[in-house]
Amino acid sequence: MYLSLATEAQKQQRDLLTHAAWGQTLSVAEFAAREQRLRAHPWTAAGMRTWLLTREPQGGGEVLASCETFHNDSFLRTPGGALEAGDSWSIASVYTEERLRGRGHAARLMALLASHLEGASPRAHAAVLFSDVGAALYQRSGYREAQAWDWVLPAVAGSAAAGVDALLQDADVARTLAGMRRPEAPFFLWPSAAQLDWHLERERIYAELHGRPRPGACGARAGEASALWAMVAKTRQLVVLMLDARTPAQAHALLRAAAQVAHRAGLSRVVLWEEPGTPALVQGLAGAERVAREDALPMLRPLRPGLPPVEQVPFPRGLWV
């Protein structure tokens, strides 16, 4: 079995097959159009690759499994406290046709891909994925999982602008992200503004296909604190992509604004992925509930020695692919 990059024709063939797994609420044609549009986005056009496991070299023969990789900037803290920049990759859309499952094809694909990524850059740090099928499959390829908790807040009526200094629009994303503090963690991946806009592009696509309005803001600012978020239409959620708050009062103001934006957009709730400092910021916010996440389990495989355990790595929702 061989690892190879997919051609454009092979990508389109996989789109038709993977609709069953990820095309909920869309027709096959709509899903295929969504995939082509997302691949054309500047972030994915620059750093996304589609990989195949095939029976013959150079993509020949039957396709046994497929996945996608997305490039991320990552940072490893040195013993002296400086940040060493590197390259990491997020893996998504791991797929094997039902008729080919149970034969270890996905595990073989992940093992070959990890070996390739180890030599893809002299600055290689890690491969990351967000599993919807538990941890066991990917543990066999050297991945280790982190605990995954969400803070869930119901959408509520009210003026989103009343409790914050500003509501943010798409054009504010890059400036807002640039002003956010980097984590104090020993290792972390950091999204680009283009990656966050990719989340908003998904929002735009579903708003168009479902004929529904987009939320009236994609974030908010309260003093020096800020948050960025995006709609996930098929689950009626507003997901917080990035949150940088210094105090509980700031976090509460930003999340209340998100809940009010969600209500006005016809969404049911706000979801914030827990990071190491999240409980101290969010506890005490009326209506907020901490729940175990049922999908998108963060998992990490080091591509070099010296990385800390996955439990010490923060995973904001903005990194999800």
Model feature map: region roles:
Residues L17-G81, R182-G219:
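Active-site rim helix/loop that mediates acceptor-substrate recognition in acyltransferases
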Residues D73-S90, R101, V232-L241:
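A conserved beta-turn-beta hairpin within the catalytic core of GNAT-like acetyltransferases
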Residues L53, T69, T96, W229-V232:
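GNAT/GCN5-related N-acetyltransferase fold signature
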